[in-house]
Structure formats: C-alpha cells, structure tokens
Amino acid sequence: MKQSLYKLALATMITLSSTAATQAQTLGCVDAQKGDKSFTLEDLNFGGKNYHNMSPKNRWCTWWGNQLVRQDADACYLVNKTTGKETKLFGKNDINQWIAHTRDIKVHSLYQTSFPYANKSIVVVNTGSKIYTIDFKKHALLSEHNFENDENILETCPASEAVAYLKDNNLYVTRGLKVWQLSTDGSRDIVYGQSVHRDEFGIHKGTYWSNDGEKLAFYRMDQSMVTDYPQVDIPEIGFNHPETQSCIATAAPDKYPMAGETSHKVTVGVFNLNTGKTVYLQAGDPTDRYFTNISWSSDSKTIYMFELNRDQNDCHLVAYNAETGEKQCELYHETDEKYVEPQNPIVFLPWDSNSFIMQSRKDGYNHLYLCTLGKENKLNIRQLTSGKWEVMDMLGFNTKRKSIIIASNELSPIQRNIFAVDVKSGKRTLADDGGKGWHNALLSTSGEYVYDNYSTPSIPRKIAIVNTANGKATPFFTAEDPWKGYNVPEYSMGSIKNGDTELFYRMVKPINFDSTKKYPVVVYVYGGPHAHNVDARWHYSSRSWETYMAQKGYLCFILDNRGSEHRGKEFEQATFRQLGQVEMEDQMKGVEYLKTLPYVDADRIGVHGWSFGGFMTISLMTTYPDVFKVGVAGGPVIDWHWYEVMYGERYMDTPQTNPEGYKKTSLLYKAKNLKGKLQIIQGYNDVTVVPQHCLSFLKACIAAGTQPDFFMYPGEPHNMRGHQSVHLHERITQYFEDYLK
C-alpha cells in the first residue's frame, strides 16, 4: 500500500485546522487504495471464515540460546542471523518417530516447542496433556510427563526439569518419578497456584520458580469470605441430556469482590524440592493487602515482593528468607497522593548479584532505577532513564555489553521502539529496524540479538534480526499486503489540544471519499486505563470494523483521552475519583473538531464502545443527548459500586470514602436523559462486567420512561467468542445503518 505522508508525532505539522475552542493537526496519512473487491465481516472480523487470510502473515520464532529457530506446524528451522536463510532442524514426523514407543498420541503441531538449554540439542514439546523432552541430534526421548484430563499444567522449570500442576484444585509438583502434593484443602474457596487479585498489578500467573529450580513460590488465595455473584449456565442447543440429568439451567456462582466490600486474602508459600516442605512468607495479616511482583535473588535464597495497602497509595518492597519465610527487611517504600501501581518485579543484573533493576513512576513517568544492596540492607538507588516518555517493557540484558534492552515511546508517544541502555552511563542506543512504527521484540538468551517483529502505518508486517550492540538489522520477513485488490479507505492520524494537553486521534474516511458531501460519523471510544487506540502500527492501529464502516459510507473517529496509557502519571491520574468526566471532556474536544470539518454531518454523530468504552458510550449519550444521535454500548459499566475491588478502588477509592464521585459517575441517575437510539449488548455469563450493570440500567430506564434497546449473548463472557463475534458486529453495524445513516 502506498503511503503519501508519514511523520512522527514530533514532526512538522502538515495541516492545521483552528477554531476558538480546538486546534488540530494532521501528523500522518495512508492514502486510500482503489480495488475491485469489497470487504465482508467474514473477512475483517476475528472469528470470520476468511479472517485468517486477511491478516498479515507472520513467522513464529523462538530462541535456542543465541540461535534463532522458526516454528510452524510441521517443522522447526534454524535461521542464520546474518543472512536470514533457514536450515531444517527436524520435522513433526521425526518427533513422532522418536516418541513412537511411548504408546502416546501423536504430536500434531510444533508451534508449542521450546529450546530451554542454550548449549544442548534439547527440545521440549508440550501437547497440553504430555510434555516430551527430546534430544533432536541423538533422536532420543529423554523424558516424558503425562497429565490426565483433570490435571492442569501451570509451569515447567528447565533448571530442575520439574513441573507444577493443578489437580482437583490442589497444587502438585513432579520431577522424574517423584510427585509432591503441596496442598490438600484446595477448593472453589481456597485457590492455589493461580493468578490472584483479579489479574491486577501485573499478575498473570500464580507460580514462580527459583533460578536454581529447587524452590517454587506460589499464591494461596482464600476467597471464602467473598460474596458470590449468581451466574447461571444454560444448556447448549442440541445437547442431549442423560436421562438422569436435569435439562434445567444450573447455578455457576462466581466469587466477585465489589468495590467497598470484603475482598479475598492472599498468602505466598515456598515449596522446597530438596526437603519436600513448604513455608509461608511471614508477611503479617493479609486482610486488605495486595502481594505482587514476586521475584528471586540470583542465589535463590531470598524472595522479594511488593506489598500494597488496600487504598493502593502505600507500596513496600520487602525481602524474605526463602528457607524459613522470615521477613528480612524492607528495601524500598513509595507513596502517592492518588495511587501507586506496581506492575513489574525487580530483576537482578546477571553480572552483579548485588544489584537489581526496579521500575517506578515516582518521577511522573515509568523509568528504570539501578538499585544496589549496601551494608545493613541499605538500598542505593540511581535513576537510569528519565524524560517525558515511558519505559513500556524491559526485555532483558546484553550481558557481554552490560546493557538493558527495553521498549519505550521515547521517539514518539505513538511509537514503540527498542533500545539498549548502558547500565554504567545510562546512554540509550536504538536497537530496532529503522526506528519507525511499533516494535515487538524477542530477546536472545545472551541479549545480543532481538527478533524484531514490527509494523508501520503503511507496512503490515516486517521482521528483522537486530544486533543490539550496533543496531545492524538483517531482514528476515516482509508480509504482503493482504488487502491488495480491495477498495481500502484513507487512514490518517493527528492531534488536538485540550488546553495544553495533546490528544492523539485516528480518522478513517469513507471509501470513495468526496469532500463536497456530508457523512455520518461513528466515534469509537474506549477511554480507560491500561489501553490506547491510536499508534504507529499498520493503518494507525485501526480496528478492521472501522474499515467495514468506511465501506458503508461512515467516517470513523477515535481519540485517546486522558486516562489512557503510556502518557505519564499526570495524564493517567487526571481521572482519579471521577471516572468518565475528564474522559468525556477530551472526547468532546474531538467532537468539536469534527464539527469544523465541512464533510461531517453534525446531526448524524454516533458513538460505540465496549467495556469501559461501553461506560463511555452511555455516559456521552446521556450527558450530551443533543450531540449523539445513536450509540451502541457493549458490556458497559453502569455504576462503579458493582465493579471489582482492585481496579475500581484504584481509580475511584471506595464508595464509603468517595460517595460523591460514585454518584456523579453512576449512569443510573442519567437514564432519564436518554434521547437518541441506544443499543446495549451484554454477554450473559460476563464475569468481568457482570450483567447486574446493564440490567439495573434497564430498570432505571423503565422508571424514567426512556427506551433503550437490548441484546444478550447467552453463554458468552465479556467478549464474544468465535463466529459469534461476526454476528455481534453484524448487529452493531445494522443498528447504525437503521438509525444513523
């Protein structure tokens, strides 16, 4: 696809539109593309029958030490890092031949293979129920772990070749022929080895192996005191029930701690494979506390974690003796008037077991800090990175050059680039291919190379192998434009100002755009924390549904308001204790800009969003009822009283301490303001935004005499799965077709 203009967000302004209230500048544009074909939702929507063919092709790779291996369903290939050429290592048929004598089922795909030992020709193949360890040079099966259907693999440990798994809600560890049962009281109320605190604070799992593989730290969560939300499972269509089984819907209650209510209690255990014993960290009473970002010392003798109070404004980094569970010392303490949100564990330097890297936003942006343990556990802290940009991820270390490999948005707020940071000087060197676009990198074991998978607004996908020391890139793969031959709209990106705050937007113009015509507009909104919609990926990260709507003759507009991610603490915390208010103010600046455009029909503006975006959709429809004619809100939060403790209280405090904020942001009191056409869509079995939200809003509308439309997906969670997603977007599209066009 031809790109006529692409400028970074810091580059020279291309066009300027000015009113007394709003300034806007266009920062980049990808031209429309003429073609003979038109899109369907089967092409563009996840779950669609042709979606796979319409997505940019990819190459799946992993590192074998410093060697790059490409994986596909049928074979694994060694990739030459300087030429990009491939040599076959082994195939699926080879694996099945080497394990044939085990009487087990065949391996059907090699995507789930790993090469955990840099200097050994060993591959680990995980089929879900079997884990095979194979020497692919000797063509020999070294070991296998067999798991029954009721056993859930949690985490394998290459260092000790042990595996942690769950069975009947209890935690087990196996190594060789030995099996240890770590718990006996596991149940729906007592949860072991799984993610806790509703997946907040960077928690995505519940087990943590020590570096030597001889100890396993794990979460234990007691949620017996948490109120059940009464979810219900209904029978599947066409399911033939046994004569002994009722065909009546069954109760499937879910533990759901709502804001201001009793939350669960979490403790951390440490199992020692050498002694077969478990100790628990002596962290004190776990009531109304959060334990997160578990990590280990280099020698596996000490365990660290961040401890946060329920108000989430007082955070401590604490060290514990991994043998006894005793508290050793508090290393670091951070407070904030609004909230502290620890998301990343500390990581020790590979060349210095006395120093580690910590991430913090204490200066207003997420940055790296070098921490060195001194006498009497005094922590010496030196800031390594600084500036009005954020470290987005820490990928690891280049041990030879003593540098840290990071992803950041230093070059532009809408980009993600890879840098090597020298630990001694703090100097940063670009370590990706070209410095433009959005880069996702996979770091080699030594840190000398990154597998750089990226896109730009005009490039669907490129992959390069980059030397982190000198930035030299070896091209590996370039995806063809999967939309070649189709009629594709123009995608542009720019910014507007709300006071001194710059806000980035994306615009998708209708196909066959005519500037002399007036077009209906759909404003797509999310608006919440830990997300953004506008960046320098292909088509400025446009959702495929926007392309479909452009084909239908709509202009689509998306703006990242204050509260969204990667713009610093002040930008995010502007919404504190008043979710939706500042966000609406920013979104309306976008609408003001739209109204200055001669091709926008200001009488036909619609809005659509999901989850937090559903909350924003109804907020906008009921706060500015004369602006938005049509809205579609999916899985909307209606009242923050009913959202989960960790997320809700971070941004709103508790209902007890912020009653005015909860009332002001509740949509129940705005049901009477609804004037336009509003459709609410909900997954019946949503455990994220429970159906109580939308059902209560419907009750409020009945009482107020307003008339929203409503549709529910039985059996579906917060997001529609599989082909039902196509059905969902057909419904959303048709609603705008019926009432906005």
Language-model regions, residue ranges each:
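Serine-hydrolase catalytic core recognition
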Residues: 228, 300, 439-741
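C-terminal segment of classical bacterial N-terminal signal peptides
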Residues: 15-23
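Beta-propeller folds
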Residues: 7-8, 24-440, 448-449, 459, ...
